[in-house]
Amino acid sequence: MESQQLSQHSHISHGSACASVTSKEVHTNQDPLDVSASKIQEYDKASTKANSQQTTTPASSAVPENPHHASPQPASVPPPQNGPYPQQCMMTQNQANPSGWSFYGHPSMIPYTPYQMSPMYFPPGPQSQFPQYPSSVGTPLSTPSPESGNTFTDSSSADSDMTSTKKYVRPPPMLTSPNDFPNWVKTYIKFLQNSNLGGIIPTVNGKPVRQITDDELTFLYNTFQIFAPSQFLPTWVKDILSVDYTDIMKILSKSIEKMQSDTQEANDIVTLANLQYNGSTPADAFETKVTNIIDRLNNNGIHINNKVACQLIMRGLSGEYKFLRYTRHRHLNMTVAELFLDIHAIYEEQQGSRNSKPNYRRNPSDEKNDSRSYTNTTKPKVIARNPQKTNNSKSKTARAHNVSTSNNSPSTDNDSISKSTTEPIQLNNKHDLHLRPGTY
């Protein structure tokens, strides 16, 4: 009797143990021995069906085959459905689309862990693991930025953001047109500077301040891919990416060169429109300056023809060069070289006239010596006139004496005197002057 109860009890316990292994409906807090007899048959059927689908090993002669015994082989695990990564490591839909990622439009385009050096990836609170951007993310490029100023900050100011872990950095807007790329890349460079990456941005000479790391290059590539879709990139950017799709540094370097070129073009146009020349500088230097500006503008695609160039040059002429505006203003076929020939001619004439003039100041003593020497040269003329006056004075005295004594003298003497007054007086001097008495 006891043997029958033990065998029955062992049979029940063995079936319940199998049920606890094969069935998923058994709760962990339930006693595996507390099973009703009506469920034992269901457990046996389930275990039999599972054993029929698996390959069983041949039973040993020492151990009898038990139809209720489950196979010890491990259950097969299905292969991952999304590439080489295991399924339990894949990001769930809720994790991939937290609040704030909807502004990107395509969150699945970020297959990497965000760059951890940037303060934008250190939002307050331990629960935030993804970048949290304000509601302005994804706005058009024409939307004004809340950040003050449009100029770029230097790398030193950008490095100061390393200590601030609560500062949020506004990302660049989405690029929506190839024509907007020059303006978009300025905001992207501003974004990199605010993200503590100002040192990797190429400088004026085309070289960054420091070497970029692999993590920074990954961050650069992914952010560029997110905010600048390939269909909106200019042709020259696509050409660079076709050679190396990760060479974002070359794109930034070329963009900075184009910015500098645009600034130089504007400066050249302003300089050419405000030319001034009056001969104070050599004509060769003035010609070199003007021709270099015109050649640089022509090479950059801004064509300046001879007519426009001559008008701009002549408008800035002053002084002795001003008359060229009136002598040449109707000459439609005049070239810049012909205009500079006239400018050189006037400049050489000015230099020749300046060299012919004395370049020293006369002393007052020299002027006195010159006046004395001039008086000495005229002195013989003064001396020559003195004897004439003395002779004339003597003749007047003689005539007065003759007139006073004419009453006592005979008439013949009076006739001779009257006759002598009508005849010219001969003066013996070296100038041989003939004077009439009536003139004095």
UniProtKB/Swiss-Prot annotation:
One cellular component (GO) term of this entry: cytoplasm
GO function term, MF aspect, one: RNA binding
Main location: cytoplasm
Modification type Phosphoserine: residues: 416
Keywords: Cytoplasm, Phosphoprotein, RNA-binding, Transposable element
Residue ranges, compositional bias (Low complexity): 1-16, 153-165, 402-418
Domain writeup: The C-terminal RNA-binding region of CA is sufficient for all its nucleocapsid-like chaperone activities.
Record's function text: Capsid protein (CA) is the structural component of the virus-like particle (VLP), forming the shell that encapsulates the retrotransposons dimeric RNA genome. The particles are assembled from trimer-clustered units and there are holes in the capsid shells that allow for the diffusion of macromolecules. CA also has nucleocapsid-like chaperone activity, promoting primer tRNA(i)-Met annealing to the multipartite primer-binding site (PBS), dimerization of Ty1 RNA and initiation of reverse transcription.
Pfam families in UniProt: TYA (PF01021)
GO biological process annotation, one example: viral translational frameshifting
Ranges for region Disordered: 1-93, 126-173, 352-440
Subunit structure as annotated in this protein's UniProt entry: Homotrimer.
Site (Cleavage): 401-402
Record's compositionally biased regions (Basic and acidic residues): 429-440
Start and end residues of each stretch annotated as RNA-binding: 299-401
Induction or repression: Ty1-GR2 is a weakly expressed element. Induced under amino acid starvation conditions by GCN4.
Biased composition (Polar residues): 48-60, 127-152, 419-428
The keyword Transferase belongs to this UniProt entry's keyword annotation: no
Subcellular location: Cytoplasm
Note, other: Retrotransposons are mobile genetic entities that are able to replicate via an RNA intermediate and a reverse transcription step. In contrast to retroviruses, retrotransposons are non-infectious, lack an envelope and remain intracellular. Ty1 retrotransposons belong to the copia elements (pseudoviridae).
Keyword Lipoprotein attached: no
UniProt protein name: Transposon Ty1-GR2 Gag polyprotein
